[in-house]
Amino acid sequence: MGVSGSKGQKLFVSVLQRLLSERGLHVKESSAIEFYQFLIKVSPWFPEEGGLNLQDWKRVGREMKRYAAEHGTDSIPKQAYPIWLQLREILTEQSDLVLLSAEAKSVTEEELEEGLTGLLSTSSQEKTYGTRGTAYAEIDTEVDKLSEHIYDEPYEEKEKADKNEEKDHVRKIKKVVQRKENSEGKRKEKDSKAFLATDWNDDDLSPEDWDDLEEQAAHYHDDDELILPVKRKVVKKKPQALRRKPLPPVGFAGAMAEAREKGDLTFTFPVVFMGESDEDDTPVWEPLPLKTLKELQSAVRTMGPSAPYTLQVVDMVASQWLTPSDWHQTARATLSPGDYVLWRTEYEEKSKEMVQKAAGKRKGKVSLDMLLGTGQFLSPSSQIKLSKDVLKDVTTNAVLAWRAIPPPGVKKTVLAGLKQGNEESYETFISRLEEAVYRMMPRGEGSDILIKQLAWENANSLCQDLIRPIRKTGTIQDYIRACLDASPAVVQGMAYAAAMRGQKYSTFVKQTYGGGKGGQGAEGPVCFSCGKTGHIRKDCKDEKGSKRAPPGLCPRCKKGYHWKSECKSKFDKDGNPLPPLETNAENSKNLVKGQSPSPAQKGDGVKGSGLNPEAPPFTIHDLPRGTPGSAGLDLSSQKDLILSLEDGVSLVPTLVKGTLPEGTTGLIIGRSSNYKKGLEVLPGVIDSDFQGEIKVMVKAAKNAVIIHKGERIAQLLLLPYLKLPNPVIKEERGSEGFGSTSHVHWVQEISDSRPMLHIYLNGRRFLGLLDTGADKTCIAGRDWPANWPIHQTESSLQGLGMACGVARSSQPLRWQHEDKSGIIHPFVIPTLPFTLWGRDIMKDIKVRLMTDSPDDSQDLMIGAIESNLFADQISWKSDQPVWLNQWPLKQEKLQALQQLVTEQLQLGHLEESNSPWNTPVFVIKKKSGKWRLLQDLRAVNATMHDMGALQPGLPSPVAVPKGWEIIIIDLQDCFFNIKLHPEDCKRFAFSVPSPNFKRPYQRFQWKVLPQGMKNSPTLCQKFVDKAILTVRDKYQDSYIVHYMDDILLAHPSRSIVDEILTSMIQALNKHGLVVSTEKIQKYDNLKYLGTHIQGDSVSYQKLQIRTDKLRTLNDFQKLLGNINWIRPFLKLTTGELKPLFEILNGDSNPISTRKLTPEACKALQLMNERLSTARVKRLDLSQPWSLCILKTEYTPTACLWQDGVVEWIHLPHISPKVITPYDIFCTQLIIKGRHRSKELFSKDPDYIVVPYTKVQFDLLLQEKEDWPISLLGFLGEVHFHLPKDPLLTFTLQTAIIFPHMTSTTPLEKGIVIFTDGSANGRSVTYIQGREPIIKENTQNTAQQAEIVAVITAFEEVSQPFNLYTDSKYVTGLFPEIETATLSPRTKIYTELKHLQRLIHKRQEKFYIGHIRGHTGLPGPLAQGNAYADSLTRILTALESAQESHALHHQNAAALRFQFHITREQAREIVKLCPNCPDWGHAPQLGVNPRGLKPRVLWQMDVTHVSEFGKLKYVHVTVDTYSHFTFATARTGEATKDVLQHLAQSFAYMGIPQKIKTDNAPAYVSRSIQEFLARWKISHVTGIPYNPQGQAIVERTHQNIKAQLNKLQKAGKYYTPHHLLAHALFVLNHVNMDNQGHTAAERHWGPISADPKPMVMWKDLLTGSWKGPDVLITAGRGYACVFPQDAETPIWVPDRFIRPFTERKEATPTPGTAEKTPPRDEKDQQESPKNESSPHQREDGLATSAGVDLRSGGGP
C-alpha cells in the first residue's frame, strides 16, 4: 500500500466501507479496524508493499488460511472471512484496480476524499475511456507516480476543475454504478467454510466490454513525449462509447489531458503490438501493465540488470510487440545511466549486424532506420506502422543487448537486509532467502553455499542458538528441524536439561538435532543414566547389570568396612577425635564440579540460609579470605540460579551489608575461573558510605550457566582512597546504588607487627623488614649464604647507631618479587638481627606511603612514587642493529669498568640486556683520580635523526629585569634522572669483557640518557621544560630562565620568588628530577652560566689566560674561541685583537707550529686589563635603550646602551668579501644589533646612533642599497651623536671612515695614465708624455698584473691624475678600498694592502675610469688603451703554432704555411705532440687522384668506428681531385642511410659528374640508381672484392680515424657528431699540401693556369714511346698526359714518363718526382710494335687495353 500507521489504517477503513456500501453492505468502523489489524498481523508486508488488487488479495487469503491451520479458526475474527470474500469478488470484477501506490506519500483529508471519489466510482474518466476507463485512470496515476520516481521531476499538476462541475460528474458516475449493480444483482455473503474451500489459484477474470480504444489511445499519445511502454492490441473494432467531458485529472494524467486539448497526440505513452487475429491488422492500443514495469525496475535496482529473475521479467516484456521507441524508453526508465549507454550501444551494433546479414535475403524489407527508429521512422507514430517481422527483429536485438550488459555481482546489500524476524518461522525465512538468492544467481553449488551461510548469519538469535552446535556439520534440513519449535522457553529448557545431565549445551543440542530423525542425534538417543548415546535408561546395561562393590576399610576412622561418606565415628581406632565429616558439594559425585564454594560463612547453616529474608545480614568483617595470600574478600551466592543469554544482567544476592571500614572503598571484580564456565561478572565500586546489601552483577556469556548456593563468584577488594576537594552532591550515599569515591590505591594497614616481606635473591628466598629509612638493602649475616662471595668496604653505615665491619656482595644480585625484578648490590652486616629491604628495592616494587590526611598522603606519594615519565622517543633512520665488538681492556681499567657498572646498576641507571646492538665502552681517569665510564656511541648516533638544538644560544643574565630578586637552582645528575624511552634502551647496550674469555661477556643497556648520545642534550631540555611548565603557567608574571640543568627564577618580590622556588622543587621532584639544595643561590652575588651577577651589574667570572702552552694552531684556536665567548662583556675591538687573529693565518694543519708575536703579546696584555674591569648592566625594560655604532679602527664596534653598556657587539675578524667598505660594516652591525636586541628583549632598540653626519647618512641612503635594507622596519630614531660617557670617548681617535681622496669625476688638470695587465704576468703603465713602464712576473695572475700596473701609477705620480683601464675589477676597487678592510685570505692581499697605504699617503685626489678594450674606435683614450694593451702581448708565432696544434693536430705543412715558421719547427711540433707520432708521418696529399678538376669524380664508402656506439657506421665521400672529404655518422648502411648521406654531401660539396663505389647491396639498389639518375650523376662500381679500385677513399678512412683518435685523446667531446665534425674541419680546412693549399681551397678555389710541362710517355699497349705531350698532373706512382692527337687524357704509371728536353742534360720538370728514364736493357730495346692508340673514354678519363687504370697506385 505504501501508507502505514494511523493514516494507512484510516485510508483502508474508508476504502473498505465505501466498497461494501456500494454493494449494500454496511460494516462497523470497529470491525473494519479489527480486520485491518488482523490483516497486518497475518500479512505484515501489506501496508508497505501490497495493494487492493486481485493478486495481492489472493496472497492475503493464502496467508489467512495458513494462519487458521496453525492457530485454529477461533483465532480469526468472525468478520474476517466475509470481508475478504466480498473484496475478492469486487476485485475480480474490477481486475487491476490499484488504490494505493508503493510510492504514495502521506495524504490529507481533502486528498483522501478526492482519491476515493475518482477511484471508487465509475468516474467520468470511465466515460472518457469507455468501459475500461478505470483501468486507464489507474494507468495515468501509476505512470505519473512512477515517472516521478524515475526522473525525480514530477509533472506539474493542472488546476482542478470547478467543485460544482466535479460534484455533477460524481453524481452521474454513481448512477451508472447503481445501474450496473441492478443488472448483476446482489452478491450473497460467503461464510468461513466457503472461504476455506476457495480455489486460491483461480486467476481468471470475467471479460468486459471495451470502448473505441483507437480513438481513446489517440487522445493519450504524444509524438514528442514517451515516458513508459504500454502494449497495443490488434482486435476488431467495437462500437464507439459515449464521450462526456472528463474531470480535470492531476499529475501525468493532467499533462495528457492538456496535450489532448491542444491537438493530435498520437503517442502519449508507449505501446506494445499484440495481434489476436490476422484478419484485421488495425492497431488498437492497450496499456502495458505498470506492475510489470515496476517489477522490472525493482529487479534491476535490487538484483542487477543481468540477474536471472530480471532476465525473466525482460522476457515477459519481450513477449509483446514493442517499437524501438518503446524499448528505449523502457531501458532508460529502468536501467542506470551507465547500463543504459551499454544497452543502447549493444542494440545499435546488433541492429547493424542484422541489416548486413539480411542485405541479400530481405532486401528492401528491413533497414537500419526501422530497427533504430531513426530517419523517417524517428517519430513514434511512424514506428507503429512497422510490420511484425521488423518488430520481432527489434525485440530480438533489444533482448540480446539487454543480456549483454555485464553482471554487477551479487547485491550484498539486498541479502544483508534479508533477516529473520523475531516472530517469523525459520522455514518461512528460508523460503524468502532461497527466492532472493535464486533471483540473483542460478541454482548450483555457489548459490547453495551462499544460502547456507546466510541461513546462519541472518537468522534471529534464538535460531542461531539452536543451529550453532550443528552449524558446520548440519544441512539446511537439519537447520529447519532444529528451529521447528524455536522459542526462548525451549532454549532455556534445553539449557536446564543439559545442566542437569552434566553436559555442555552444544553437546546436548548436537545429540538432539545433529542430523538424526525424530529429534534424536546422529548416534541415536542418549541415556539419562550413563550419559552415553545409542540407548535409553530402561535399556542401560550399566544400571541393570552392575551393582556397587562392597566398601573397603574406612579411610576416616580405619575401624570398619563402610563408605567414608557413611562414617559416623567420632574417634579413630587410636581414640583420637575426628573432625566433622564434610558434606559440601565437592563430596557429591553426582553433581557437576564447578567453582569451589567459599569457606563456611556465618549464616550458611542458620535458618532460612540465603533464601530467608529473616536471616541476619553479614558484615564486611564476616567475609573470609580464600587463602592467606588472597588480595580480596570472597563474595558467595546465597541462592541457586540458572542464567541464560536472554536473562541479561542479573543481581546475585550475597547478604553482605555495608558500611565498609573507615577510609576504604570497595572494588568488586570477578574470578578468572568464572569466565571458563561462561559467567561474566561486571565490576562495581562500593563507596565507603554505602549501607545497603552488596549484590554482584552477573550475566551469562554463553547459553545457560548454573550458580550454586554458596559458590564463590566474586572478590571484594578493600582499597584506601584520597579524598579530593570536589563538590559533593549528597552528604551520604546510604543504601543507594554503586558509585565511586575518588582515587583508589592498594594498601596494607600499619599495625604492631613488623612489615615483613619475602623476596627472592638469585633464586633464594629471603625474609626482610621494609625499612623506608634505609638507603640501601642490608642482608643479615645469618641469612647470607656462605658460598656467596663478599668483600670488605672501608665505609661504615650510620643510622641510630653505627655498624662496623660492613661487607658488600662481590657481584650484583637479581631480585624478584611477584612480576617485578631488578638488580641490587646489597651490603652484608654480620650483627644485623634481620634483613632490611631498603629504598633501592622498595622503589622498584612500587611501595607507597599513605596517611589519613589527604595533604600528607599526597606529599608522601609524590616523593615515594617513581615517575613513569620518559624522554621522547628518538627517531631512527634504520632499525638495522649496529654491533661493534668490545675491545680488550687492561686489568686496571677492567676493574674500574666493573665497579662503575655495578654502581650504575645499583642506582638503576643500567639493566641487563640481550639487545642485538652493541658499542664499545672504556674508562678514563680524571684529574681527581676517579674513573669515568664512557661509551663510543658514534655508530649509534649515525643511525638516528638529529633533533636539533632547542636553544641555539646561551641565555644572557642582562635580560633579567633590573632590580628583580633572583634565585638560581641546579639539577643534580640531570641526564641520569631522565629515563630513556623503553623502545630506545636496547640501542645503547654494551658488553663488559672477560680476560681470556673466562666467562661470557656481561651485557647491559642504559635506562637513562647516556652521555655521548648526540640527542641527549635536546631530550634533557625538553624533559625539564615539560616538568617546569606548570610553574611557568602558575607564575606568568615571573621571569624563569632554563638552560640544561640550570634554572634561574626572578620576580620583583622576594617572598614570591621564594614561593616559586618551592613550587619549582615540587614540580621537578614530581618528574623524578632532583635539586641540589647545597647549590641553591639566592638574591645576590650569584654565579650563572659563567657570569657573576652582583646587584644590577653582570661580569664574567675570573678568567686566567695561560700563554705557556700556546704552541700549535689548535692551541691558538681554542684561545681565540674562549675570547670570542667573553667578548660581549669586554670593550675589546676587533682591531685590538687583530694581531692574535693573524696568528691563525698560514698552514691549516692543526698541529702546525705557531708563536706569539710582540703585537699579539700586547693584545693579550690589553685583554687581561679589560677583563678586570669588564662590567655590563642589566636592562630596565620600562626605559628606552639605544644601539650605538662606534667608530673603531679596522672595523666598527657596537653596543646596546642604557645608562651604560648592556652588551658589546663585535664583527668577525675576517669578512667573507675580499674588500668590504667601512660603511658596509656599519650596516652589518645595525642588522646584528637589532637582531640581538629582539633576541634578548623581544624588541627593537629605541634609538640607533651612527658614526656619520646627517649629510653623509643621507648620501649613504641614496647611494648604497645596504643602508635602507639595514633599517627596514625600524620605527625608532637615528641619532648622530654618541651618549656623553667617558667609556665611549676612545672611539673619537679613529679617522677615515668615509672616502675623501677618490674623485667620482675626471679631474680637469689631471695627468692621463693608461694601465693594463695580462695573464702572462706583464703589466704596463703608460703615463702621458713618458715612456711606458713594463714589469714582468711570470708568477702573477691577470688580476695581480692589473693591480701592479695601478700601484706603479700611484708610486710614479703624486700629482692629480686620471687613470683609465679596461679592467672592471680594478675600477670596482675604488672608492671602497680607501676605507675598506681587506681579507687576508685572498692571494692579492699584499698588493691590495700596499695600494691602500699609497692611497692613505696621498695629498692629491685622483680619478679611476673604465674604458672598453679592443674596440678599434678613434680617439686619444681608445688609442692610448690599445697601445697599452699591445705592449702586454709577448706571444710568438711558434707559441701560436703550438697552441693551434694542441687544438687541431694538423700536419706540419699547415703549421708552416699558417704561422710562417720553418719546416723544421713545424715538424718538431708534430713530433713532440703526444698524440700525433703514434700515427706516423702523414703522406703527401694528391696521391692517386682520378679527377682532373673538382666535382668530376667522387669515391664513396662506409667505414666502422666502434667508439661511436650505435653511430658506428661512418659514410665517407671524397673528391678524387681536391681530396675534399665529407662524412656522416649513422646507425646503419642501408639504402636510406646512403640516400641521406648523399643529400648532405651535395649540400656540402656540390654535385659531381660521377660517383664510384664498391658493389655493396645498398649502392647497387634500384633506389640509389633512380636517385642518381634524377640528379644526372653517373655511377660506376669497381671490381668486386678488389679494394684497389677504392684506394683514395680507403686512404681517407685511415686519415679520418687517425684524426679522430688524435682529437679524442686531446679533448672532451660530447657526441660522436661533434668529434667527427672537428676531424673534418681539420682535414678540409686546416691541413695543407706542399704548395700551402687546403682541400677546401683546392675544391672551391680557381683552377691553376700555370703552363703544363711537356713529357715523353710510354704506350702500355704498344710498348713504344710517344710525345712530347702535355703533362696534366703527376704524383707518386701516377701521371696523366694529354696526347696532342687524342680527345681525352691518358693515365700511365709515373715510371713510364720522361721529361722532354732539347738537351740531354735538361732539368727535370717539376712534378715528375725527379724521375729518370729506366736504364735497363729491356727498356732500351723496346720498340713500338703496336701503334694503335689507347681506348678513349667520354668522361675525360682513359683506359689502356680495356683496363681501368684508376684503381692503380695506392699510397
UniProtKB/Swiss-Prot annotation:
Binding site residues for Mg(2+) 2: D1316, E1346, D1366, D1429
Active site (UniProt): D771 (protease)
Chain residues carrying a lipid of type N-myristoyl glycine: G2
Cofactors, names only: Mg(2+)
Residue stretches making up the RNase H type-1 domain: 1307-1437
Domain Integrase catalytic: 1490-1647
Motif PTAP/PSAP motif in this chain: 305-308
Domain of life: Viruses
Binding site for Mg(2+) 1: D970, D1045, D1046
Catalysed transformations (reactions): DNA(n) + a 2'-deoxyribonucleoside 5'-triphosphate = DNA(n+1) + diphosphate; Endonucleolytic cleavage to 5'-phosphomonoester; dUTP + H2O = dUMP + diphosphate + H(+)
All copies of domain Reverse transcriptase, residue ranges: 905-1093
Keyword Nucleus annotated: no
InterPro entries linked: Aspartic_peptidase_AS, B_retro_matrix, B_retro_matrix_sf, DNA/RNA_pol_sf, dUTPase-like, dUTPase-like_sf, dUTPase_trimeric, Gag_p24_C
Molecular function as annotated in GO: aspartic-type endopeptidase activity; DNA binding; DNA-directed DNA polymerase activity; dUTP diphosphatase activity; RNA stem-loop binding; RNA-directed DNA polymerase activity; RNA-DNA hybrid ribonuclease activity; structural constituent of virion
Stretch list, region Disordered: 151-191, 572-631, 1699-1755
Residues annotated as signal peptide: none
Its EC number(s): 3.6.1.23, 3.4.23.-, 2.7.7.49, 2.7.7.7
Binding annotation for Mg(2+) 3: D1501, D1558, E1594
Biased composition (Basic and acidic residues): 151-169, 178-191, 1716-1740
Family: Belongs to the retroviral Pol polyprotein family.
Described purpose of this protein according to its UniProt entry: Nucleocapsid protein p14: Binds strongly to viral nucleic acids and promote their aggregation. Also destabilizes the nucleic acids duplexes via highly structured zinc-binding motifs.
Protein name: Gag-Pro-Pol polyprotein
Species this protein is from: Mouse mammary tumor virus (strain BR6) (MMTV)
